[in-house]
Design a protein with these regions (language model features):
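Terminal (often C-terminal) interaction modules
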Residues: 1, 5-6, 263-315
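Histidine-centered divalent-metal-coordination microenvironment in nucleic-acid enzymes
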Residues: 45, 51-71, 131-146
Length: 315
């Protein structure tokens, strides 16, 4: 038998916000303190991104993602410019006096100065983000020091250029750029049908239930960001279903239909395809595996669940 409506009543809600706003404020205060090494003339903005910003976080959601972006230095994408616009851009720009490499080191050193002590080292940076853990803030935080990423569509002689803004960063020990568009992502997600965000939470909670409570030797290895993008490609006629159980199975039907070409699916920002080979794209086979296992859970709910009264999404 299929998953009952009562289970989706548990799965659709948001998790508690365990202090993300307070954590962001304390990081901003640290970066703005007088002894911070960050260049006084640098234009820096700090904001939340990810599930806490997008209102798709669930009970037990992990670290809060905080972006620290250098806007006075940027990585340009100018392939859309014609030759005249490209020449104007080249003539009007120069190498920055304060580089991204300097900035990200300064952010790391500032956070270490503020939160580390001889007896406690909660600030670490080994991968993409600077991690602040061990109770230094109300919630564990991933801080991403990045620079502005600018996609130019025009650079006129008079007037303002047409630009889409994103963010670009490198892991601490890598050279490959990671590029995404969190503000466009947020705006587009907000403009979707009002059921969109709760549907994302349902699928994230269904994934977590499968991994923790389902009688299976398999698991669902599907990052939350990609689930959010996948559901964004579901038509509004399905998202608007008031019955959450009907909505869930109709989404499975739609996404598993032979009529759908998953290679055409966009990310929420619509700035990049969802599936592909870049470091910000998903593999189609992983999405298909997730859908197959969620379908199995739908079809065999009373046979294979382990009987836990699991109240995901309730704080």
């Amino acid at each position: 038998m299929s998953i009952p409506e009562s289970q989706f009543d548990n799965w659709h809600g948001t998790g508690a916000d365990a202090g993300s706003a307070t954590a962001r404020k304390r990081i901003v205060n640290a970066l703005e303190m007088d002894r911070s090494p960050i260049d006084d003339d640098a234009q820096v903005v700090t904001f939340l991104q990810g599930s806490y910003k997008n209102d798709t976080h669930t009970y037990g959601s992990s670290d809060v993602d905080i972006v620290v972006k250098l806007e006075s230095t940027w990585l340009p994408e100018t392939s859309n410019l014609d030759s005249e616009d490209q020449a104007r851009y080249d003539n009007n720009t120069s190498n920055p006096s304060y580089t991204y490499s300097e900035f990200r080191k300064d952010v790391f050193n500032t956070l270490k100065t503020r939160f580390n002590s001889p007896s406690s080292k909660p600030v670490k940076w080994d991968g993409k983000a600077i991690e602040i853990t061990d109770g230094a803030l109300p919630v564990d935080v991933d801080v991403v020091p990045c620079r502005d990423y600018r996609v130019y569509y025009s650079y006129p002689e008079n007037g303002e250029p047409d630009i889409d803004h994103g963010m670009a960063f490198r892991p601490r020990y890598g050279t490959e750029q990671v590029i995404n568009f969190p503000k466009i992502h947020y705006q587009n997600g907000t403009e979707k049908h009002s059921n969109y965000k709760e549907t994302v939470r349902i699928f994230k909670n269904a994934r977590d239930y499968y991994n923790e409570y389902w009688k299976s030797v398999f698991s669902i290895d599907a990052p939350s960001y990609f689930i959010e993008c996948l559901i964004c490609n579901v038509p509004a006629r399905i998202l608007r279903r008031s019955s959450r159980s009907n909505r869930f199975v109709e989404i499975l039907d739609h996404l598993q239909s032979d009529c759908n070409d998953l290679t055409t699916f966009d990310q929420v920002s619509k700035m990049e395809k969802l599936f592909g080979d870049s470091n910000t794209q998903w593999e189609i086979s992983e999405a298909e595996t997730m859908l197959k296992r969620l379908r199995s859970m739908w079809d065999n709910w009373y046979d294979q669940k382990q009987g836990a009264d699991f109240r995901l999404a309730q704080s």
